[in-house]
Structure formats: C-alpha cells, structure tokens
C-alpha cells in the first residue's frame, strides 16, 4: 500500500502546536489531505490526546517563554507514548533566542524529523547561508545542508527551497516539484511541517519513503493548484491548493514526480 493510501486509511490524529498565523490553514490542509488535526495547547489535554496520536508538530513561529515550556511539555508526553514528533524551527537563524530554543528541543528531546528551509537548517549546523527569517531561496547546496544536519543530529531532515532535499541515514534525495506561488501564501511552509508529521509515523523504518511521498504530494498539489483558473493569484491559489490536497492521487504523484 502506498503512503498516501495508508494516510487516508488511518486518518492519523496529528497534534499541531503551531504559530497563531497559520492554525486555520494548517487544520484545513490536513483535513483535506485525510489526516485528523487537533490544535491543542494545554498540557493536561495533550496528555489525553497524544495517547491516540499518530504525530506531533512543534512549530516555533509564535515564540514566547510560555510557548517554549509548552513545546517541552508536549515533547515529553510524545516520547512517553512513542508519538513521532516533527520540529519546524521557524526563523531559527534570525536571532539568538530562536536558535537557543531550537537547540534545546533538538538536543534534549526525541524528534522524528526536522523540517525547515535552507537558511534555518543551515543555521542549526553552522553553515553560512543568506536567509530572511522564514524565507530562503536560491541555495545551491541544499543536499549538503540536509546531509550535514542528518549527520549531526542523526534524525531525518527535510530542507525546503526552490529544490527540496530529504536526508535519512546518510542517504539524500532531492525533489524538483513545486510551485512558485507557494512562497506568496503565508503558511505553506508551516502546513508542510504538519504534513510531514502526518506521514512520518505511518510505516516504521520507512521514513525516507514516507517523507518522499509527503514532499511529492505537497509539491505536486501546488503545481496542480497553480495550473487551475486564476491559480497565479495568491487568493485563488490558496483555495485551489486545499482543493488539490483533497483530490490528489497516487497516479498524479507517479505521473508528475521529479526526484533525483
């Protein structure tokens, strides 16, 4: 069974502790894809929900001291119930405090994967890359950045940009699909982190396969959305992207995938 069919069959509960700007978009995107999102932020509630969850997303976009404590509490509970956790270290290269939080979560808690743009992941491993907070484009060595992070942290890494790279156990693949409209809609990267959290726990020991499918489904849905009437306009693209996530099939992935 393909990872996409498995996701739709299991409809995994995905706990999304994400930034305030993208909660609605993230929830709707996951529902369209076939997952079951919950946007809980109360530790006692998380204790109950994570017992049944298939994934946890920690997105540090809306960073406060209280949220830092929440991330820590959620990761402790996730480890207790063996729930795979994905970290999205938003803008961790933009300042010392964000970097400190990201380092703490990576070094002191169990993560199943890290998803970030080239600038964010490069900052975690000490590689100098021009980055504007949550935006990073035109990076030539994205596969090297992914491998460096995979080697340093010994967990799967997803690095996004004009080309995306996935590194698992020293192996790297690059994804050459996607839409130029994605950076023009706030929250597309954050939703991707939640999609990664939806796929990462579907098949134990098959993380590379699951992550590759997650990236292809997401990026090809973007291509489909852009090709639809007025898909070149951000508002229309946003709606059509959700529609494409709902409609995308394994046949679409097989036909349009560009992987190296």
Curated annotation (Swiss-Prot):
Pathway: Cofactor biosynthesis; thiamine diphosphate biosynthesis; 4-methyl-5-(2-phosphoethyl)-thiazole from 5-(2-hydroxyethyl)-4-methylthiazole: step 1/1. Substrate binds at residues 39, 187. The keyword Metal-binding applies. Pfam families: HK (PF02110). GO terms for biological process: thiamine biosynthetic process; thiamine diphosphate biosynthetic process. The keyword Endoplasmic reticulum does not apply. Its cofactor is Mg(2+). ATP binds at residues 115, 160. InterPro entries: Hyethyz_kinase, Ribokinase-like. Keywords: ATP-binding, Kinase, Magnesium, Metal-binding, Nucleotide-binding, Thiamine biosynthesis, Transferase. Its EC number is 2.7.1.50. Coiled coil: none annotated. SUPFAM superfamilies: Ribokinase-like. It catalyses: 5-(2-hydroxyethyl)-4-methylthiazole + ATP = 4-methyl-5-(2-phosphooxyethyl)-thiazole + ADP + H(+). One of its GO terms (molecular function) is magnesium ion binding. Catalyzes the phosphorylation of the hydroxyl group of 4-methyl-5-beta-hydroxyethylthiazole (THZ). Belongs to the Thz kinase family. This is Hydroxyethylthiazole kinase 1. It comes from Streptococcus pneumoniae (strain Taiwan19F-14).
């Amino acid at each position: 069974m393909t990872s996409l069919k498995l996701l739709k069959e299991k409809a995994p509960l995905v706990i999304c502790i994400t930034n305030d700007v993208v909660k609605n978009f993230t929830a709707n995107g996951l529902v369209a894809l076939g997952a079951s999102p919950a946007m809980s932020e109360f530790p006692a509630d998380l204790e109950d929900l994570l017992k049944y969850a298939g994934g946890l997303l920690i997105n540090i976009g809306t960073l406060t001291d209280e949220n830092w404590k929440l991330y820590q509490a959620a990761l402790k509970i996730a480890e207790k119930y063996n729930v795979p956790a994905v970290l999205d270290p938003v803008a961790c290269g933009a300042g010392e405090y964000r970097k400190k939080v990201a380092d703490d979560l990576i070094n002191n808690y169990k993560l199943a994967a890290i998803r970030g743009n080239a600038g964010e992941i490069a900052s975690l491993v000490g590689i100098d890359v021009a980055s504007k907070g949550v935006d990073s484009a035109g990076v030539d060595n994205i596969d090297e950045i992914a491998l460096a992070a995979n080697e340093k942290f010994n967990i799967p890494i997803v690095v996004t940009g004009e080309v995306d790279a996935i590194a698992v156990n020293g192996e790297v693949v690059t994804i050459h699909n996607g839409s130029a409209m994605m950076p023009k809609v706030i929250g597309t990267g954050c939703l991707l982190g939640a999609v990664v959290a939806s796929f990462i726990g579907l098949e134990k020991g098959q993380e590379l396969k699951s992550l590759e499918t997650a990236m292809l489904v997401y990026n090809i849905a973007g291509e489909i959305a852009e090709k639809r009437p007025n898909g070149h306009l951000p508002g229309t693209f946003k709606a059509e992207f959700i529609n494409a996530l709902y409609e995308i099939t394994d046949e679409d992935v097989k036909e349009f995938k560009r992987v190296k």
